[in-house]
Amino acid sequence: MVPSGVRTGRWVAAARAAQRRPRVDSLGQPPSPESASTRAALYVHWPYCEKRCSYCNFNKYIPRGVEEGTVRNCLVTEARTLLRLSGVQRVESVFFGGGTPSLASPHTVAAVLEAVAQEVYLPADSEVTLEANPTSAPGPRLAAFGAAGVNRLSIGLQSLDDAELQLLGRTHSASDALRTLAEARLLFPGRVSVDLMLGLPAQKVEPWLQQLQKLLYHCDDHLSLYQLTLERGTSLFAQVQQGTLPAPDPDLAAEMYQEGRTVLRDAGFRQYEVSNFARNGALSTHNWTYWQCGQYLGIGPGAHGRFVPQGTGGHTREARIQTLEPDNWMKEVTLFGHGTRKCVRLGKLELLEEVLAMGLRTDVGVTHQHWQQFEPQLTLWDVFGASKEVEELLAQGLLLLDYRGLRCSWEGLAVLDSLLLTLLPQLQEAWQHRPSSPVSGG
């Protein structure tokens, strides 16, 4: 039965049938170079929220009213325009983020998905994720999103402590979060992710670990741990600056992270990325595209994208940012078909730096095969094999460089930022002194 108010098209109907099939974990191996150039992920930004959380500096707005029909039409238009511009033939995943996309109507989600499926091949079993806040996603509404084509949820739970939730400016309680999580697991079994924050002001290790243990009793097969970052311009930043709140203790945050990842490993979760943990093959296809430096298109106000504009004969990957403010973005989409505000061509070294920094965030790291897709002349051995600094990191057991490629050890993954302080300059030096060779496409 399809919930009322959800218009279904051909793709949405096929997607609902595909949701009943078992998931197959095929991540970890990069696609062939040919397919990589014709595939992309799609990010859709819904910029509106009910209120601004105290820690958040994302591009979001609290409007008096939203003309959703206009927003929907602009999202559809921009998706069509950028898909044609990119020349991609297949979209592997779609992620509705924000903002609070669970405030959008399921009809808007379905309209975007149908538009994508009309432009390119969107497999019926493609991962389609929706970020949801507990207060804006009761069970019937979640079911309506499922009927619209969503097959994976990412719930912004953040904490199971009501005092911490209040500090963060969240609109839900711990009981609200657990109720939404239970309803989501019934509707999307094996496809529900939750976020848990660490390193809050005055937060202690043991109470936080108790939260994590409690969450393990209720959660599904995917969990993300995020350390609080105090962002300038947020309420939380101001309170710490004024001395109203104590500054977060970085040593305690590091201890929480180390203890937390150990707890999750013991519970059968694979830490497949610095902040992300999965069991039973429930890795995020969409985020994996980011970490593997795959192409992705960003639509909606302030969305980011990275792709080669093959549709207009382009051969160089571009970093694109859409216009931030929703009303201005809609005006530009209406006039030009898209609201791209900034477009920067990525140099070859810039792209390789991203391949290295993003790839090392994963437990797979950067394989030789994957690296060669971006740089067929200069190998990982050429870049890192003769470096004394890298040799020292290998001896310390923080890095591994072998027949598989370059990757962090379990210990190294926890200190990746410090490792990159050695690895990125080494890449830059190797690039500067590389032998002359024909420049390959990016």
From Swiss-Prot:
SMART domains the record matches: Elp3
Residues engaged in binding [4Fe-4S] cluster: 49, 53, 56
Co-factor requirement: [4Fe-4S] cluster
Gene3D superfamilies given in the database record: Aldolase class I (3.20.20.70)
Chain positions recorded as S-adenosyl-L-methionine 1 binding sites: 43, 98, 131
Gene Ontology annotations of biological process type: porphyrin-containing compound biosynthetic process
Protein's recorded name: Radical S-adenosyl methionine domain-containing protein 1, mitochondrial
